[in-house]
């Protein structure tokens, strides 16, 4: 293990234990133990002009042992801190799912989690309070399955040492699988001109089969729906370190616009990591509501939940630009949505021969 990683792990352990020590000091001073966190809501995110990302605002909520509910949350925090510190001492790691089940073995029933969403949220809370990423706690999610295909040579750390991989020549049709912690990757060289993030596996496979990555020197990143943190981190590194334009290609519905938003602006629940995960320069290719009209794409009508989501996005500060106001307004007017693969109504090659080249040229990428 490198010195850098040892230093990161030491800092992670120290910051975790500092949380428990804070509770102890509050007890010793005769104070009720408490922990303050930023309010994680749409109304408490603000634009950081220096970093060009959306971050939490000044609104805070306090978790206090003054109530039974608050005391339980602090108890769970202490048990989780103890587990994570021990995990770091032993040089081991675990998944978020395993943490949920591991709590079943804790000797205090009140410290056990009711479901995984509760333990996941607590890990996020500990990230915020400690200022340390969960990857440095040695916590990882389940495999996202997201993959990369394109003219990129990299070096990754494995249990058997470092190995070099070319993300076209050394992989099958599936591509190179993004590791849980992409900061363990070193970029060696690339012939790529841009990055294309693709929402669906079906469209990603179409682009690869049609040779889009070869023909246009593109690094195709499969987002796999709502992108995992590792996928967003790798995308940001491709932009920041290799100076590659990043584009995002999704379905044409409000949920897919949020997928783009998580890549470009960051998500509300991980706004504390926006500078680490978000790529504010990322551009949205489509499917745009304007594309639905221009290409007369096969569509489905908007559901009530779609309409509510679109109206919510109009109030979301991350989508309050002229482009999004116009496109969302148009979608509400036409009352339609379309999938990426609806482009196949014009032939299997239309997306790679016509749609993407034309849109990328319009955006100044090609």
Swiss-Prot record:
Binding site for Mg(2+): 199, 251
Gene Ontology BP annotations: DNA topological change
Keyword Metal-binding: yes
Cofactor field: Mg(2+)
EC number: 5.6.2.2
InterPro entries: Spo11/TopoVI_A, Spo11/TopoVI_A_N, Spo11/TopoVI_A_sf, Topo_VI_alpha, TopoVI_A, TOPRIM_Topo6A/Spo11, WH-like_DNA-bd_sf
Catalysed conversion reaction: ATP-dependent breakage, passage and rejoining of double-stranded DNA
Domain Topo IIA-type catalytic: 7-146
One Gene Ontology cellular component annotation held by this UniProt entry: chromosome
GO molecular function, one term: DNA binding
Function: Relaxes both positive and negative superturns and exhibits a strong decatenase activity.
Subunit details: Homodimer. Heterotetramer of two Top6A and two Top6B chains.
Family to which the UniProt record says this protein belongs: Belongs to the TOP6A family.
Descriptive protein name: Type 2 DNA topoisomerase 6 subunit A
